[in-house]
Structures are given as structure tokens and as C-alpha cells.
């Protein structure tokens, strides 16, 4: 395989999964890094990455801002996985290129027709829509 899956069991650790083995160590490091940089996490990771951390602890200890990218289809907002993945990558580029330090500054992001939807966004959930 080209990557090691997190649900692989470790016989040497009593059958503990890779996720559960690394979770405490990664969470401690993650929290230390976030807090040392102002205590705000811009969450652009895919959903399965939450399994790597004690997400409840993360939510309790730092401010999380999650950008979301959705497309209008048939009068409803829908997540199109390939678009969401591409937008997350483009937003990372935007953050680096523009040296974004405040979550509020992400509202200026636009890409391939996706734009900030102020009406449907909150301080912790920034929605960008297409269509």
C-alpha cells in the first residue's frame, strides 16, 4: 500500500489502532503549537483527520474556524467532494501567499466562482458557495 491506514491494529500494543496509539501524542503537540500561535485553528483538513486527535479537547481549548465549500444544486447547497478538496488547497495557498493571520481575513478568499456567503456563515463556520 502507498499509505498506512489509521485503523491498522498494532499487535505489540495490545491491538490498539494506529489512531489510538498516536492520538495522545499528536494532540499534545497539536495543542501546544496552536496555543503558541495565538490559539486559533483554521481547520482545512478532511473529516477523517479528526481521528488523529482528541477532537473534544481541541474544541474545548482553542478557537476553531472551519471554512466550508458548497455548490448550489437544485435550490439546495451540496458539498461536492472534489470541489471542496480543491478549494481547501487553494485556501491554504491564499493563506500563505497573503500571510493571513486572522480568520476574518479569509472572507476575502474567492476561487473559480466560490465566494464568501456572509448570510450563511458564522464566526466559526465560514461558508463559501458557488452558483
Language-model region placement:
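Internal, well-folded beta-alpha domain core
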Residues: 1-121, 131
